[in-house]
Amino acid sequence: MENLFEKLMEQIKMPPNLRRSSQFEHADIENVEVHTASKLWHFQLIFDEILPIDTYKLLTELTETAFSTIARTEISVSSRNQNIDEQNLNDYYQYALTLPELCDSAFSSIFKKYHLEKEEEKIHLMVEDNPQMDFFVEKYFPILEEKFKSFGFGEVRITPLVDQELTETQAAAHAEKVAARLAAQTAEQAQISEIKKQRSEERESKNTREAKPEFVETALSDGIFFGRKISGQSPITSMSFIAGEGFGVIFEGLVFEAAHREFTGKESGKVNHILELKMADETSTFMISKWGRKDEEIAQFDQIVSTVKAMNEKIIADRTDGEDNFTDSLSDALWLRVQGNIEHDKYKDDLVLTANAVVEIKPKPTIDRVALQIKAVKSDKIQLGREIKNNEPVTPMRSVSEFSTNGPVVFEGYVFKGELREIKSRKTGNISYLLEFEMTDYTSSFYVQKWLRGEEEIQLAKQIKAGLWCRVRGNVQRDNFKNDLVLQLTDLIEIPTQNVREDKSDEKRVEFHAHTNMSQMDAIPSASSLVAQAAKWGHKAIAITDHGGLQSFPEAHSAGKKNGVKIIYGVEANLVEDKIPIVYNETDVDMYESTYVVFDVETTGLSAVHNDLIQIAATKMHKGNPIDEFDEFINPGYRLSEFTTELTGITDDHVKNAKPLYEVLTKFQKFCEGTILVAHNATFDVGFMNMNYSRNGLPIITQPVVDTLEFARNLYPEMKRFGLGQLTKKFQIGLEHHHMANFDAEATGRLLFVFLEELRTRNTGWTSLLELNDKLVSEDSYKKVRPKHVTLYAKTQEGLKNLFKIVSFGNVKYYAGLPRVPRSVLEANREGLLVGSACEIGEVFDAAINKTFEETLEIAKFYDFIEVFPPALYRSLVVGGSFKSEKELEQTLKDLIKIGKTLGKPVLATGNLHYLNPEDAIYREIIVRSLGLGAEINWTQGHGEHAKPLPLPEAHFRTTDEMLEAFSFLDEKTAREIVIDNTQKMADEFDVLTPVRDDLYTPKMVFDGGETSEERIVRLTYEKAHEWYGNPLPDIIDARLEKELRSILGNGFSVVYIISQELVKRSNDRGYIVGSRGSVGSSLVATMIGITEVNPLAPHYRCPECQYFECYDDGSFGSGYDMPDKNCPKCDHKLIKDGHDIPFETFLGFKGDKVPDIDLNFSGDDQPLAHLDVRDIFGEDYAFRAGTIGTVAEKTAFGFVKGYERDYDQFYGNAEIDRLAAGSTGVKRTTGQHPGGIIVIPNYMDVYDFSPVQFPADDVNAEWQTTHFDFHAIHDNILKLDILGHDDPTMIRKLQSLSGIVPQDIPMDDPGVMKLFTGTESLGLTEEQLGVKLGTLGIPEMGTFTSMNMIAEAKPKNFADLLQISGLSHGTDVWSGNAQDLIRSGIADLSSVIGCRDDIMVYLIHKGLENGLAFTIMERVRKGMWNKIPAEEREKYVEAMREHDVPEWYIESCSKIKYMFPKAHAAAYIMMALRVAYFKVHHPILYYCAWFSIRATAFDIGVMGAGLEAVKAKMKEIKDKGFDATNVETNLYTTLELCNEMLERGFTFGKIDLYRSEATEFVIDGDTLIPPFVTMDGLGENVAKQIVAARAEGEFLSKMELRKRGGVSQTIIENMTNMGVLEGMPDDNQLSLFDDFF
């Protein structure tokens, strides 16, 4: 038999010498417990003897290492002979103190100096005398004993025994320490006295010592006196000078907190008393403790507590009365002189003076300074533990590692995440509180933890939340669970916000270029934070200029109103020319007969102004043949950069003896005479040539220039990349040394003639050079070029609408990789706009570094103002080589300012901000780098493997002073003009605009005969009401309809109702039932016109024959469906039961003016048609999908941080990763559309009155356009229809088709159906067969694990109870910890607890509360506001409820609720559920066919068809996996539950049938269901439909034919064969060999 222990030893690589030793001779494995969920393996081993400690530790370490990739490990040891060696015993003892369960500093630091002694069968722990020993024994000794058991010592009992020798030794050591401390204090006293002098207001001169007040010590009868007397002449120590332990220290001070505590020793049973005080002197505060040794001392403890309590009550009373004279409030305070030893209290983790003498002192000294100390302690400033002095050294978090700290450290920083955790002990049930938060000092971040002791600490901890700045002290330890370093907190004190930047300038600038987090993957701040910062600095306005979009406008608008800041609405758009020419300086010449000079230049950088030519090379060609060459290097006058040489291959040796520039230029001009110039990306080469010609007094290029880049783009639009390398590769043209001008020029020439020949091949007949631009340039040529940035700002409301149009055109008509704005579109919609020159990608800046001053001047005329940034924002251009120095950059900015002044256009210094503060730069860095090198923003320097990211600029929000400093290279007047004066003047030119309207705008509808929506709703309402309830109507119905119609018509809501009615009617006409969501079922008008089936009237009977009406509005029935069946007393016809008692106020509010939100559940099959119905009703220009914005979520941001850490060689702790991820969230990543939301534009307006438009996720092939704004932003201003898809209507439609039963005829109180909610009887099955207690599996809303548990506990009996179940299961904090507890305790039953929101209003009205008050209470409760409203308001509601006998449990239940479900929504759900359940009970095979066709999402058709045993085995397999089961397995388990139920009821599954199976739906064959094709693994819906379509064309003669006609893969064919689907079918049809002959 295999020795498992030996196998384990081999696996963990235990050294052979140990494995063969006597220690392991008879060792064995008794048991191995594998905890799958927690990934823990627990080995239980047995040995002959207790192992030596070193062997035991090696065993545990090797096991842990060997299994580290699989699971955590634990080892428990037992020994057959428990011979205890005292040395080994103590070795294990010291080892135990290092284990996590016992390494608490308060315990291990004291007990590690003790030792164990064995006395016969007893084991004693030799300890010193310690008053806290009972506490330690009770808390830690059971753990210690359990550990020794796991070490192999068996059941041991460890008892403490006081070691007198040790006690004396410790006392002597302590005395030595105190003596040293007193010696040090001698030197301190002079310093203390000097500081006291300085603080004394009464001193006359620096050298005059304050007279010490005479204190009178009083006897016990006259005051407080414990222990020996304290001499009035003894030196008094200031509390602030205590830094460590000390002996014989005396304090004098005021007692401001006191507590008398008692505890009973577990061993002795003795009651111990301790007095705990907090005292203050004029320098600080301190904790004092005094153990009660005598009865008379203990008696005075309560006297002290009483005195201090009275003082604190006076302080509170004075402040309540509006007084805050803190010093006067201390007039009756208790003053003490105390003497004792200062020790570090491990339990409190602080220094405490343990007093041996206490004396009350009178008269009291001046208390002003002491009052300040107490006030600081009692102020709003948060403090946990001891004070941390300002002069204590603060450690940067980045410098802390696991091995760099020894002892406490102090951090200072910002809390960015925190929680107070309540932890319940599994063993004892005791609740402990753990404070956990994360903080950063922006060098790194740290986890901080503290176990809280006492209510005071818990209450303080609740205030430690994100946003707090604090100083903390504690010890750094590694937390294995968090896998990071954690500061174990001892002390915390709130500090003022650090590093706050202020705008101290008397006059403030206005920022005109600001990005929010709606600049896609490029900026960090929300619009709210941006505007709040501007307001904080006193800026009167700020401009929003996101990239290509306006999605931050609604938030900015709200923030502007809130903060009193004018919002200037703008955008940084992508400007393109309408058509990009192929030929510049075009003339009418024959392009096939002309001579061409194909040239290329190499330069030292990208700027024609600041970089130099180093090579000009050209090939002169005629009819495709080279006829001459030109190749000259040029000496720039300085050494070439490494980057230039790397890119071009040109070295200093190439250029050092080259000809002068002027000579080369004149020679080249002569070479080019009478030719057409050709270049690839000609604007670059021509720009450099013209700049150098101009500088050297030579004429610029005027002959035609052909750009082969644009030639290729227009000739081969299907290509994606048009670089010279890609093109030469495609056309097999040699390019040996790319980026050397001579080789590039020759390759470009050969490409030109390839293109000309292509034109000839296409028989275009074009010969003139003019025809290239006129006929070849595509209308879409703008799509391929790199756009130039331009900033657009709306000055007026008309301008804002034009801005909406421009952005819409860019996102819809001209979208190509990003939204583009053709210049013609901008010019056509320029009214009301200002146009700025934008950034370094703008054409003005581009011209300034690449063109002559005159050319730049001409380009700048298009703009209304010129923008310049601080030099730091152009950093990438300097690093990338466009500028050789900062001076060149500064000169360019001066040139731009000069251009502005020359043209009379204002120049504005703007910040191009992308984040708020300098420390936020890392967040943008992470976001931008996540895009990958070469992305639009993530520019690189170099190519291929040498490519490196260029640095991102310092793009924080700058104060006025910071901006002025950035432009300090200008004269002071100019700097002030562009930073302050011009920005303020321009801000004043803008109107106050409103991008989001205040009112609701609905379309106007006119029907046949001129009937308006208002007239139609009235007509339809009363037609149905009279049909159901007679004419005249009963008063209660007439009043209800009149009230509702008054609200609907008066607020313009009729069109909302009528649109919904029309959509429901159209879906009904197509054979589908429509379910309602939300509170629309609260409206009787909605019921009457057919929007919802839910009837909100009180439970009632009505007669369909004679309209008899009988109503129960006293609350005696929760639903009309629960009333007994009854015949009409007038005509004896069976009465219809209806009504759920739902107030109208829950839909449109108490005043009836809340915008109606009608959500409808259409069948998923019919939803697309319902969407198109809206477009059909209103027109394509007035119906849009509701837009959504997808932002970077926390998990995605976490991935970005980890990617950045990997790609850029960083290392972050987990807390720092949390911070960086949190800072990177919320940035716009994509756009989308609401799954069912349709926005309807009024037909008397257009969409640009409300929002720009775009395609969802920039998909230009999408069927619908969406609103550009997130639909929530315009929800209250425009009609939104929620046309949602749901499975329930699809199920009902399927069941109706199968059965012919009309859904409305199904009773809502069928007894068999109701029994499903109490057991399995209706199914004819037992609980054991089914595996669950109820029959609700597969019933909508009622078949989940959670809902079934709730049903089983709540025991619903009728429809009203099911409404409660629906409300309880959808609410938050309504069931768990609330209604559940009430039902369990018998205080209330299901019918009386709060289930749905409407129940509160109805219940309170029935109790007698006024309707308005009942409504208000309901609103406060349902929104979770009960505990957030002011206490006085809440108390008013509670009083009113108590006055009307509302039970206390009901009031308490209200206080716990966070969210509540509407009753109308619950009613609609339950009606659908009961209809489905009816088929499950009475037509089971139809039900299962529908359920598996529509609801099931995962299949294992092999198991399902294999019978009950196979199904149950598979269910057990998945269940045993627990949380390790995959999502697919979890979904499959749900399918198998219904499969098991179906099989148990006697039905079966057949196998897939090639000629009978459908694509997606099951087919009924007697008591058998034939599965559809999609139930096969790997066979999708499209292929399934193709098989069915091919089958309709004729029989499949072979598997090969099935593959071809059905589009089926070979893998699927093999699976079908294995499943027997293709039984008897040959692999190939022999006749097919001759198909080609027919």
From Swiss-Prot:
Coiled coil: none
Annotated ranges, domain Exonuclease: 596-752
GO biological process, one term: DNA-templated DNA replication
Signal peptide: none
Main localization, broad class: cytoplasm
Transmembrane region(s): none
Top-level taxon of origin: Bacteria
SUPFAM superfamilies: Nucleic acid-binding proteins, Ribonuclease H-like
Catalytic activity: DNA(n) + a 2'-deoxyribonucleoside 5'-triphosphate = DNA(n+1) + diphosphate
GO CC aspect terms: cytoplasm
Bias-annotated ranges (Basic and acidic residues): 194-212
UniProt cross-references to InterPro entries, sorted A to Z: DNA_pol3_alpha_NTPase_dom, DNA_pol3_finger, DNA_PolC-like_N_II, DNA_PolC-type_N_I, DnaE2/DnaE/PolC, DNAPol_HHH, DnaQ, Exonuclease_RNaseT/DNA_pol3
Keyword field: Cytoplasm, DNA replication, DNA-directed DNA polymerase, Exonuclease, Hydrolase, Nuclease, Nucleotidyltransferase, Transferase
Entry-linked Pfam families: DNA_pol3_a_NI, DNA_pol3_a_NII, DNA_pol3_alpha, DNA_pol3_finger, HHH_6, PHP, RNase_T
Cellular localisation: Cytoplasm
EC code(s) of this entry: 2.7.7.7
Region (Disordered): 193-212
Molecular-function GO terms, alphabetical: 3'-5' exonuclease activity; DNA binding; DNA-directed DNA polymerase activity
Keyword Membrane attributed: no
PANTHER family: DNA POLYMERASE III POLC-TYPE, DNA POLYMERASE III SUBUNIT ALPHA
HAMAP family the record matches: DNApol_PolC
NCBIfam families with a match to the protein in the record: dnaq, polC_Gram_pos, PRK00448.1
Purpose: Required for replicative DNA synthesis. This DNA polymerase also exhibits 3' to 5' exonuclease activity.
Family indicated by similarity: Belongs to the DNA polymerase type-C family. PolC subfamily.
Identification of the protein by name: DNA polymerase III PolC-type
Species annotation: Lactococcus lactis subsp. lactis (strain IL1403)
UniProt gene name: polC
